[in-house]
């Protein structure tokens, strides 16, 4: 220890630069040597025990808790993208914090700098600002505490009801479940919309795309589906409950506010989470919102519960991702989208799954929404998402303006796996309906040219017109599956063939009121059995025949 101290003293006493040795320097070195000799002699006089006690005291008193943070500096900032020098060990998609308090996410890891997307207004950041790593990949709060709340893409409450009390958190970019934990779709996810539940049934764990032009009723189908779950969520059976997450991407704030009010009025907000990244939010937040909502839904799926997530809409997420990618100088591809835009949506939608019993038996059902331009379903993003999903509900402007609402094109709409989940009662009544409607559309095109139609063709046209009328349904008025079965039964069994098409809607409303008030036992039997037994069939036939006789009179 003495030799170390001697060496240190000599080093301090020697001149800093060897090239500057002069007479003065030599003189100072002699003085240093003399001082060193004096201090050395003093140390020798001090007892060894005393030296060791002083050293021990110094070592024990030293502050060993050194808090090291890796930091960098902003080289340039603009359009929501910060180029940061430093942060050599930063991870991809790691959250970083700017000196202004704003958060960002590292996306481009380059040799000399890091490309960071900013979650907020980049005017608060200036060149030279310090950026520090947080060491955490972007995560959001999850759990039942979020039900009934409106949050942003990072899970912060934006509804003015105070902070969210959730203690659990999940990363937003989790990997989708593999093949082994999954099981085929087998339970129905009832939307309450006749045209969907009968012709394009959706199962729990399915991905069903809702696609169409703007203002064709895409969001209405999604909202009706959420409202319809009230009949299951008000019960006590956890296996029947379906928790809902609605992700609004790039929409107007007024639209989101109206939607929240509609859900509140229908008493559906208590089992719903709304994740909002509006048009005025930064592009990175619009990109992140679907993944955040998905993580919230996965909490229910992985705890043996059932959840439904609606992405409204993924076209705007793709546009936000394109903006970010181009500003990060990534090479553009078709329609200027980056090369990994397919992966952007596939890694999100693959997280919807029906888990097997060994993994809790939960499910996450996804209803992504895509907006088309002038009905062009062959554009880049629509074809991508169609190929990823398990079917699509195609909405047409032409049908919408004809008054056929929901404006579902039954020919182009398909559900690839949902028929396995359809209830037997609905299969019994709706089995022939899709074929009859397809034949009707085919014949209707030729019927415009000639009046000499045979009886069979006229019958097809007559039935098709009435079934089309029967599938019309008002907004925000979902129906229970047993009520749908009773109404569709009257149509497909030919009881309405003599009724004027203009009177179909009036008949439906009156018939439903009659069945609900007078024949509740029959509806309960259909709901409990899940099928139409011979006894129920005979009873339904009698009810429809008697009611029609009174209705027409």
From Swiss-Prot:
Q: What protein name is recorded for this chain?
A: ATP synthase F(1) complex subunit alpha, mitochondrial
Q: Which residues does the annotation say bind Mg(2+)?
A: 219, 312
Pfam families attached to this UniProt entry: ATP-synt_ab (PF00006), ATP-synt_ab_C (PF00306), ATP-synt_ab_N (PF02874)
Please give the function described in this protein's UniProt entry: Subunit alpha, of the mitochondrial membrane ATP synthase complex (F(1)F(0) ATP synthase or Complex V) that produces ATP from ADP in the presence of a proton gradient across the membrane which is generated by electron transport complexes of the respiratory chain. ATP synthase complex consist of a soluble F(1) head domain - the catalytic core - and a membrane F(1) domain - the membrane proton channel. These two domains are linked by a central stalk rotating inside the F(1) region and a stationary peripheral stalk.
Give the taxonomic lineage as stored in the record.
Eukaryota, Metazoa, Chordata, Craniata, Vertebrata
Could you tell me which residues carry Omega-N-methylarginine? 204
Give the multimer and partner information: Homotrimer. Component of the ATP synthase complex composed at least of ATP5F1A/subunit alpha, ATP5F1B/subunit beta, ATP5MC1/subunit c (homooctomer), MT-ATP6/subunit a, MT-ATP8/subunit 8, ATP5ME/subunit e, ATP5MF/subunit f, ATP5MG/subunit g, ATP5MK/subunit k, ATP5MJ/subunit j, ATP5F1C/subunit gamma, ATP5F1D/subunit delta, ATP5F1E/subunit epsilon, ATP5PF/subunit F6, ATP5PB/subunit b, ATP5PD/subunit d, ATP5PO/subunit OSCP.
Family, per the entry? Belongs to the ATPase alpha/beta chains family.
Q: Which organism is it from?
A: Bos taurus
Q: Which GO terms describe its molecular function?
A: ADP binding; ATP binding; proton-transporting ATP synthase activity, rotational mechanism
Modified sites of kind N6-acetyllysine: 123, 126, 132, 161, 167, 230, 239-240, 261, 305, 427, 434, 498, 506, 531, 539, 541
Q: Does the keyword Repeat apply?
A: no
Binding locations of ATP? 215, 217-220, 473, 475
Q: What else is known?
A: The siderophore enterobactin (Ent) produced by enteric bacteria binds Fe(3+) and helps bacteria scavenge iron ions from the environment. As a consequence, the mammalian siderocalin LCN2 plays an important role in defense against bacterial infections by sequestering iron bound to microbial siderophores. LCN2 can also bind iron bound to endogenous or nutrient-derived iron chelators and plays an important role in cellular iron homeostasis.
PTM note: Acetylated on lysine residues. BLOC1S1 is required for acetylation.
Which residues, renumbered to this chain, carry the PTM Pyrrolidone carboxylic acid? 44
Give the principal location in a single coarse category: mitochondrion
What positions are marked as the site Required for activity? 413
Membrane topology type? Peripheral membrane protein
Q: Name positions with the PTM N6-succinyllysine.
A: 161, 167, 230, 239, 261, 305, 427, 498, 506, 531, 539
């Amino acid at each position: 220890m003495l030799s170390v101290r001697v060496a240190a003293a000599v080093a301090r006493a020697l001149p800093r630069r060897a090239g500057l040795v002069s007479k003065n320097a030599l003189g100072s070195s002699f003085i240093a040597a003399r001082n060193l000799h004096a201090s050395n002699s003093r140390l020798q006089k001090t007892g060894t025990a005393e030296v060791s006690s002083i050293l021990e005291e110094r070592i024990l008193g030293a502050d060993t808790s050194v808090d090291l943070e890796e930091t960098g500096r902003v080289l340039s900032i603009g359009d929501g993208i910060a180029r940061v020098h430093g942060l050599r060990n930063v991870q991809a998609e790691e959250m970083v914090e700017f000196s202004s308090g704003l958060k960002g996410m590292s996306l481009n890891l380059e040799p000399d700098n890091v490309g960071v997307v900013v979650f907020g207004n980049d005017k608060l950041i200036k060149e030279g600002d310090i950026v520090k790593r947080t060491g955490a990949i972007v995560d959001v709060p999850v759990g039942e505490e979020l039900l009934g709340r409106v949050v942003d893409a990072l899970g912060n409450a934006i509804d003015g009801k105070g902070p969210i009390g959730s203690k659990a958190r999940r990363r937003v970019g989790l990997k989708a479940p593999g093949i082994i934990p999954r099981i085929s779709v087998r339970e129905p996810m009832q939307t309450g919309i006749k045209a969907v539940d009968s012709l394009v049934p959706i199962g729990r764990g399915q991905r069903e795309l809702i696609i169409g032009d703007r203002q064709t009723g895409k969001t209405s189908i999604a909202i009706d589906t959420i409202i319809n779950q009230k009949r299951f969520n008000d019960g006590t059976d956890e296996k029947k409950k379906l928790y809902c997450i609605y992700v609004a991407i790039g929409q107007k704030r007024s639209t989101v506010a109206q939607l929240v009010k509609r859900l509140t009025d229908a008493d559906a907000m208590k089992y719903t989470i709304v994740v909002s990244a509006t048009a005025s939010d930064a592009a990175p937040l619009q990109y992140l919102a679907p993944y955040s909502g998905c993580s919230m839904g996965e909490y229910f799926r992985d705890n043996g519960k059932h959840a439904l997530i609606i992405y409204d809409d993924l076209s705007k997420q793709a546009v936000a991702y394109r903006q970010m990618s181009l500003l990060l100088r990534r090479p553009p591809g078709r329609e200027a989208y980056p090369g990994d835009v397919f992966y952007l949506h596939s890694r999100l939608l693959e997280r919807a799954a029906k888990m097997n019993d060994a993994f809790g038996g939960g499910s996450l059902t996804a209803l992504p929404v895509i907006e088309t331009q002038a009905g062009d379903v062959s554009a880049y993003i629509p074809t991508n998402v169609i190929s990823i999903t398990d079917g699509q509900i195609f909405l047409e402007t032409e049908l919408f303006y004809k008054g056929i609402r929901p404006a579902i094109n039954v020919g182009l709409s398909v559900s690839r796996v949902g028929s396995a989940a359809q209830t037997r009662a609905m299969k019994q009544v709706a089995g022939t309906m899709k074929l009859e409607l397809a034949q009707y559309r085919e014949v209707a095109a030729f019927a415009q040219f000639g009046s000499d139609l045979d009886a069979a063709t006229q019958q097809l046209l007559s039935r098709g017109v009435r079934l089309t009328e029967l599938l019309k349904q008002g907004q925000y008025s979902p129906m229970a599956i047993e009520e749908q079965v009773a109404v569709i039964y009257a149509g497909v069994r030919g009881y309405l063939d003599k009724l004027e098409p203009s009177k179909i809607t009036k008949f439906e409303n009156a018939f439903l009121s009659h069945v609900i008030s007078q024949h509740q036992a029959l509806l309960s039997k259909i709901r409990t059995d899940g099928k139409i037994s011979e006894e129920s069939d005979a009873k339904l036939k009698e009810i429809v025949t008697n009611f029609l006789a009174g209705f027409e009179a």
